[in-house]
Amino acid sequence: MNLSKLGKNQIRATVRAQIHPDGQITGDRNAVYMGQYAANLRRRYYAAKDSTEYINQLETEENIKVKKFETRELNVFSPRITEFLDFEKQATVNDDLIYVNPMIFLHVSKCPFIQTERQLPLEMPYTEHILQATMLTIPEGYAVEELPKPLNLKTEDGQDIVRYNISQSGNTINVTYTSVSYTHLRAHET
């Protein structure tokens, strides 16, 4: 019996940020963690010595400076946690160009598959679903020279999907990132 889809394991995040002429990015993120993501956040939060240590770890992982941090449902028995944070991040500036990764908060910062040998199928502990919407406002007088291309990827069986859509409307860059991963990665049969 497959029990992997009993609960919803999801992160839904909205990021609103402003890029300043000096390359400073300021903004806020509102994220809802559900299921195993909420359990993992609780585990990491309580493993830290205090909230300051947790925030310091978050700043290091995300390469940001947290200005304000708040959670809801962290201390209750609930399948979800809501996290609010105000942040600052420095983009790379070269002369009058500002280089920005529109994915301010990365879904994956390093590959989890680091073993030299792997046996397929790979079994993941739970189904993952990440949805992140980012709205970046560029500084007045600046123009976007190049945007990454939209990307849609999926496995042959359609079980794992990554969608990365990016567009510009006026001085706002909109990024929608969706990743859905199920619990098995199988070897391709020829």
Cite the ranges covered by each PLM segment.
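A sensor for short, sequence-defined functional sites
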Residues: 1-186
